[in-house]
Every structure is written in structure tokens, then in C-alpha cells.
Amino acid sequence: MKKSFLAAAFTLGVTLQPAQGQDFTAAEAHARLGIEAAEGQYLGYASLCDLEARIRNVNLPKQRKPANAKQGERRPTNGYRPKPTHIPATQVFDNLWFLGTASTTTWLYGTEEGYVLIDGLTTDSQAQKYVIEGMEAAGLSPSAITAILVTHGHGDHYGGADYLAERLGVEILMSQKDWDLVATLGVHPRFGAPPRTGGIVEDGDVLRSGSSEMTIHLTPGHTPGTVSPIFKVHDGDNQHVAMLWGGTGFNFGPDVEIFQTYADSVQKMRGIAKASGVDVFLSGHPRRDGSVKLLAQLSSRTDDAAHPFVRGAGGYALFDVLEHCALAQAERFLTQSDKR
């Protein structure tokens, strides 16, 4: 392993080159391509190619209830965790709002005729602060939310969903496989209990709210039933097409088959995105896709300036990063398995 080259790539954004007389392994070759694709727009994803990273599995069934917690009681965020960086509710497009923190966001899609909330943030208190109070401060009506789409069954995306669903009287939507996943999870000390009931979305479903609609695409890998929606956004007279990659991290254990499934999902969505004319690429984690920086650029945008969130053809480098990093990790663990 040329560890010094990998370290340089992650800390400095340097393109990897093999030392004279040395060749990259298959894993290192994919990692190099993934890191190169991340340079510029997608540095937040480059760590996925770290071949020294510990790959944990957060999808395993487990009871994580604190010893002093009552059955079913939702627990507050751990005190030792730093407070998330606050970002005010921000209108990114005419029909798309950013609600959340620099760590985790929920995207509010639609108009006052009807909104779909994409993900539910991490806790009840975050949902209250960033969704309910954030919308009200921006002059929006939380009561116009008609559904909560949870992209995948991890607590940082469903943590506040139950609270919002109960308060607003709306349904939580997930894929069947991720409903099955959350049914195996216990009460998390930070995120609380996972949602237990709601609606099911399937591959190709069209979710409508008011005059807005989005198409749901099943992209397994991050979890068995991760979904990635595609929807139209408007910037004045200009229309664009956005895709939100529903699940990013490799926190499903050193499973070669799942890494390959992840890569297959990336290939699938690359084709769908091109056919749909996608030119806006979003994430539920702003530090991944650079949304924090883009929001700052948006705040100072002049009338004749390009929209910072519209990446155009260059945005498709995201798929190269995700695919090569997934294949790099697959090769890494396949090689380790062969050596046993």
C-alpha cells in the first residue's frame, strides 16, 4: 500500500501517482480515479476512497436503548456532542428550501400548495427548530407539508420524522426494505426510536404534492432500501432538474457484495440522471456536496450570475467518485478475504 500517496490525496487533494517501478493494486487504482473525480466540486466525498478507513456496520439489528431509558422513550442528544452549526432556512430555488445544519439537512420541496419534506433531521428538537420554526420564520406554512420522505433508515434522517408526522398529521414514506430495516433497530440514545408505521414507496413511483412532483428511484447500498428522488426546480424563468443521492457513507460493514450493489446503484442513477437532464446534485449532508459553500455563494449572487447549485455536466463527476470509491473498497476487502 502506498500509504503516503493516499494520505497526500486526502489532506492536500493531490492526484495519486505510483512510485517508479511500482503498480497500483486494483483497489488503489479505483481509489485514485475516485479521488481525482472528487477534486474541485466533490472533495467532501473523497474520504470514501480511504483504503485505511474502518468500515463499521450500523445496519445490524441491535438494542441500543440506554439502561435508564423507559421503553419507547425518546432520548435527547448526548451532551458531549458539539452543537450543530446553525444555518437559517434558505430558499435555494423557487420551489426548494434548505432546512437544517451544516451536518444534516432536510430539503423542503414544493410550494404553499403542498410540500414534500425530504428526511426528518436527527432529533425531535431539531425538527421543531429547523423545520417548524425555520419555516415559520421564513413565512412558510408547516401545515402545507403533505408527506415526509425518509431516504433511508438511519437515525440522522428519521430522528425527527415521527415528531413531525404526529404534529402535522402526515405520513412518513420509506421503501419496504428500509421499513424492514428500522423494525430491527432499538431505541438510539441520540436519535430515539425509529418510526414504526407509514407508507411505502417503490422504484419509479411519482410522489405528488400540490403542483409539484418527484420520481422515486431505489438505490440500495448505503441501506437495503435507500431511495434517491429526482425532481424539477425553478430559478425564475429557468428550469433545472435536481437529484438527491439518498445515502452516501460506507457504513454497512466490509461486505464485498454490498459494495458492488452500491456501485450498481450508482451506474443505474448515472443513466437515469442523464436521461432526465439532471444538472443539480444534492445530498442530505451539506459537508459532502459542498452545500455550505454554495449557500454562501447564493447569498451574494447577483441577478445576472449563474446559480451556484447548478453544476451542469461537471456535476456527473459525483457518479465517478461514488462508483470508483465503492469498487475500491470492494477490491480491498476481496483481496483481504483471498489472503485468509
Language-model features: locations:
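Bacterial N-terminal signal peptides
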Residues: 7-15
